[in-house]
Swiss-Prot record:
This is Methionine--tRNA ligase. Keywords: Aminoacyl-tRNA synthetase, ATP-binding, Cytoplasm, Ligase, Nucleotide-binding, Protein biosynthesis, RNA-binding, tRNA-binding. One of its GO terms (molecular function) is ATP binding. It comes from the Bacteria. It catalyses: tRNA(Met) + L-methionine + ATP = L-methionyl-tRNA(Met) + AMP + diphosphate. GO terms for biological process: methionyl-tRNA aminoacylation. CDD domains: Anticodon_Ia_Met, MetRS_core, tRNA_bind_EcMetRS_like. Homodimer. The lineage of its organism: Bacteria, Bacillati, Bacillota, Bacilli, Lactobacillales. The keyword tRNA-binding applies. InterPro entries: Anticodon_Met, Met-tRNA-synth_bsu_C, Met-tRNA_synth, Met-tRNA_synth_2, Methionyl/Leucyl_tRNA_Synth, MetRS_core, NA-bd_OB-fold, Rossmann-like_a/b/a_fold. ATP binds at K311. It comes from Streptococcus pyogenes serotype M18 (strain MGAS8232).
Length: 665
C-alpha cells in the first residue's frame, strides 16, 4: 500500500487581491495533489490564510471595520478564486479558527514550561509589512538625521521599518542550531532546488543563529499568551503550526495527523519565506519532538519584463481575467510550463497567447481534430484494434512514448513541471510526425494497405489517450474533453498506463469540437495589455506623432531613470497643526499606507489659514525623500506635492476612494 501524501501551500496573508504570482503556488500544489491521487496515494491537500498580525489590525482600522470582518471578507474572496481555479484542497485553514488558536496557545505554554521560550526585551528595527525584526546591518537602506543618528530605514523587502523596544518572549533557536545543521547534513535533499539549503546555512546559521522574538505587546489582533495575556503570539509560531493543527495535532480527533504526518510530508513555499520554513519550522518541530517533513520546495517568482508586478507600471495580471477570456486550462498550463525550477519566470502577453495558439491549438488541438476526423472517415467512427508493428513507424512511436512516460514520472516526482510537460509535448510532436510518416490518406486509397491504415488509426487514438492521462493533473477539462471525443470515460488512474491498453470496440464522437480555437494574436495581446492597464502598448489604427520641438521647462531636463527613483504615494491627513515659532510651516501627521503614521512639515501655512480643512484629505506625497530636521525637534519624513498658480498654491489631492499608500506613477 502506498504511503499517504500530505501537501501544503503556505498560508497566504490576506492583504490584497491575489495576482497570477500569488496563484502559482496553489496551482502547483494542486497539480501534485492530483498526480499523487492518480498514482494511488491517499492525499491531504492543505491551503489557507494567515489572519493575525499588526498589518491586518491596521488595514481593518483604515477600512473602518473589525479585524475579524476584514479577514472574513478576504477569506471569501480567496476561496472564490480557488474555486475558479478548480483547486482540489481538502481543508482551508484560517489561523482565526478556534481549534487552531487553542493549540497555538497550548504549544506556547508547553514551550515556555520546558524553557524553549523565555521572557526578555527586544529592541530593533521592525517592519510591519514583513512582520519581522531586522538589525541595522540587515537594512537595505538607512535614514539618518543631521547628527548622523539612524532614524529609520528600509527592510530588504523594500518596506519601511520603525524602531521598536518592548518586552517579548523569545524562542531559543540558538539552542538547536547544531542539531539543525546535523539534520541538513543527514537530509541534503530536504530543501529543493539544490543550493537553497547552502544559502540558509551561510546567511543565517553560520553567522550565529539568534533567538527569535515570538510575542508582541503593541497590538492585540492575535492569540493571547494564556499566562501573560498582554502578549499576543507572534506570527511565525502561530502561522507555522497550521501545518500540524489542520490535521488534528493537539486535538481530540488526531487521526489525520497520525496518518498523514507519518506519511510523506511535502511543503511548497515561495523563495521569500524559505528562511522561516527551513529554520524556524524544523526547530519548532524538534522542540515538540515531532518528525521532520520530507521535502521543502522554494520556487521562484513570476516577474514582468520591467520587473515586479506593479499597478503603477501597468503590468499586474489577475487570474480571473485570464480565465474569463481564455479558459482555466490555458492558465494552469502556462503557469506550470513557464516557471523553471529554481529560478524566476517572466510573464508576457505575447508568450501567453503564443503558447495557446502554437502548443495548445496547433500541436494538441489539431492532432485530436485530425485523428477523430480520420477515424470517422475511414472506419465509421470505430477505433480499430491495437496491434504492434502494423507499420514501419509503430515501434519507434511506441518506444518514444515509453521513454517519455518514464521521464514524465521522474520529473513529476521532482516537481519539475516544465520538463514533465516537455515530455508530454515530445509525445504530441512525435505523434504529429507519425501522421506525416504514415500518410493515412494514401493508405486509404483503393490500392492502399487497409491493415496499415487500421494500425495508424489505433496508434493515433492510443497516443492521444496517453496524452489525456498525463495532462490530467494540469488540465482537467482538456483531459476530459479528449477522452470524451475518443469515446472514453474520464481519467481515473495513472499508475498503469500503456500505449497498448486502448479499449476495444470504442467509437469516437461523430464530429469533434476544437478544444482550443486559434486566437487572433494581436487582438488578444492587446486585450491582456488593456486589462493590465498598459494602454500605451495597445495597437492603434492611427497614432499621433508630436512635432520635434524643444520642450519648455523651468528646470533642467532629467532622465526617466532619475524620475523613476521618486516614489509618490497617496497619504491621508490625520492631523495638522501650526508649528510654534514659524509662520510658514504646517506639521502634518499622515497615513501613507505603510503601517505607521509619518510626520511631514510643509511651508504652506499662509495658503491654508484654516489648516483643519486639510484633515481627511488624501494628498500626494514624495515618500522616499531622506528624512531631514527642519525646525527644533521636528523631522520631516517626506514632501507634500502642490501646484503653484500665480501667487496661489494648492495641494494636490486624489479621490477619497483611492487607498492610502497607493503608488502614483
Amino acid at each position: 500500500m502506498k504511503k499517504p501524501f500530505y501537501i501544503t501551500t503556505p498560508i497566504y496573508y490576506p492583504s490584497g487581491k491575489l495576482h497570477i504570482g500569488s496563484a502559482y503556488t496553489t496551482i502547483a500544489c494542486d497539480v501534485l495533489a492530483r498526480y499523487k491521487r492518480l498514482m494511488g496515494h491517499e492525499v491531504f491537500y492543505l491551503t489557507g490564510l494567515d489572519e493575525h498580525g499588526q498589518k491586518i489590525q491596521t488595514k481593518a482600522k483604515e477600512a473602518g471595520i473589525s479585524p475579524q470582518t476584514y479577514v472574513d471578507n478576504m477569506a471569501k474572496d480567496v476561496k472564490a478564486l480557488w474555486q475558479l481555479l478548480d483547486i482540489s484542497y481538502d481543508t482551508f485553514i484560517r489561523t482565526t479558527d478556534d481549534y487552531h488558536e487553542e493549540v497555538v496557545a497550548a504549544v506556547f505554554e508547553k514551550l515556555l514550561a520546558q524553557d524553549d521560550i523565555y521572557l526578555g526585551e527586544y529592541s530593533g528595527w521592525y517592519s510591519v509589512s514583513d512582520e519581522e525584526f531586522f538589525t541595522e546591518s540587515q537594512l537595505k537602506e538607512v535614514f539618518r538625521d543631521e547628527d548622523g543618528q539612524v532614524i529609520g530605514g528600509i527592510a530588504p523587502s523594500g518596506h519601511e521599518v520603525e524602531w521598536v523596544s518592548e518586552e517579548s518572549y523569545f524562542l531559543r533557536l540558538s539552542k538547536y542550531a547544531d542539531r539543525l545543521v546535523a539534520f541538513f547534513k543527514e537530509r541534503p535533499d530536504f530543501i529543493q532546488p539544490d543550493g537553497r539549503m547552502n544559502e540558509m546555512v551561510k546567511n543565517f546559521i553560520e553567522p550565529g543563529l539568534e533567538d527569535l522574538a515570538v510575542s508582541r505587546t503593541t497590538f492585540t489582533w492575535g492569540v493571547p499568551v494564556p499566562s501573560d495575556p498582554k502578549h499576543v503570539v507572534y506570527v511565525w509560531i502561530d502561522a507555522l503550526l497550521n501545518y500540524a493543527t489542520a490535521l488534528g495535532y493537539g486535538q481530540a480527533n488526531h487521526a489525520n495527523f497520525d496518518k498523514f504526518w507519518n506519511g510523506t510530508v511535502f511543503h511548497m513555499v515561495g523563495k521569500d519565506i524559505l528562511r522561516f520554513h527551513s529554520i524556524y519550522w524544523p526547530i519548532l518541530l524538534m522542540m515538540l519532538d515531532l518528525p521532520m517533513p520530507d521535502r521543502l520546495i522554494a520556487h521562484g517568482w513570476f516577474v514582468m519584463k520591467d520587473g515586479k508586478m506593479s499597478k503603477s507600471k501597468g503590468n499586474v495580471v489577475y487570474p480571473e481575467m485570464l480565465v474569463e477570456r481564455f479558459g482555466l486550462d490555458p492558465l494552469r498550463y502556462y503557469l506550470m510550463r513557464s516557471l523553471p525550477v529554481g529560478s524566476d519566470g517572466t510573464f508576457t502577453p505575447e508568450d501567453y497567447v503564443g503558447r495557446i495558439n502554437y502548443e495548445l491549438a496547433n500541436d494538441l488541438g489539431n492532432l485530436l481534430n485530425r485523428t477523430v476526423a480520420m477515424i470517422n472517415k475511414y472506419f465509421d467512427g470505430t477505433v480499430p484494434a491495437y496491434v504492434d508493428n502494423g507499420t514501419a513507424f509503430d515501434a519507434d512511436l511506441s518506444q518514444l512514448i515509453d521513454a517519455q512516460l518514464a521521464d514524465y514520472h521522474k520529473h513529476m516526482e521532482a516537481v519539475d513541471y516544465p520538463r514533465a510537460l516537455e515530455a508530454v509535448w515530445t509525445i504530441i510532436a512525435r505523434t504529429n510526425k507519425y501522421i506525416d510518416e504514415t500518410a493515412p490518406w494514401v493508405l486509404a486509397k483503393e490500392d492502399g494497405d487497409k491493415a496499415q491504415l487500421a494500425s495508424v488509426m489505433a496508434h493515433l487514438a492510443a497516443s492521444l489517450r496517453v496524452v489525456a492521462h498525463v495532462i490530467q493533473p494540469f488540465m482537467m477539462e482538456t483531459s476530459a474533453a479528449i477522452m470524451a471525443q475518443l469515446g472514453l470515460a474520464p481519467v481515473s488512474d495513472l499508475s498503469t498506463l500503456a500505449l497498448a491498453d486502448f479499449p476495444a470496440n470504442t467509437k469516437v464522437v461523430a464530429k469533434g469540437t476544437p478544444i482550443f480555437p486559434r486566437l487572433d494574436m494581436e487582438a488578444e495581446i492587446d486585450y491582456i495589455k488593456a486589462q493590465m492597464g498598459d494602454s500605451s502598448a495597445i495597437s492603434q489604427e492611427k497614432e499621433w506623432v508630436p512635432e520635434e520641438v524643444a520642450l519648455k521647462s523651468e528646470k533642467d531636463v532629467i532622465t526617466f531613470e532619475t524620475f523613476d527613483a521618486v516614489e509618490i504615494r497617496v497619504a491621508e491627513v490625520k492631523e495638522v497643526s501650526k508649528v510654534e515659532g514659524s509662520e510658514k510651516l504646517l506639521r502634518f501627521r499622515v497615513d501613507a499606507g505603510d503601517g505607521q503614521d509619518r510626520q511631514i512639515l510643509s511651508g504652506i501655512a499662509k495658503f491654508y489659514p484654516n489648516e483643519q480643512e486639510l484633515v481627511g484629505k488624501k494628498l500626494q506625497i514624495v515618500a522616499n525623500l531622506k528624512p531631514r530636521k527642519m525646525v527644533k525637534k521636528y523631522i520631516s519624513q517626506g514632501m507634500i506635492l502642490s501646484a503653484e498658480h500665480g501667487d496661489q498654491l494648492t495641494v494636490l489631492t486624489v479621490d477619497s476612494s483611492v487607498p492610502n499608500g497607493s503608488i502614483i506613477g
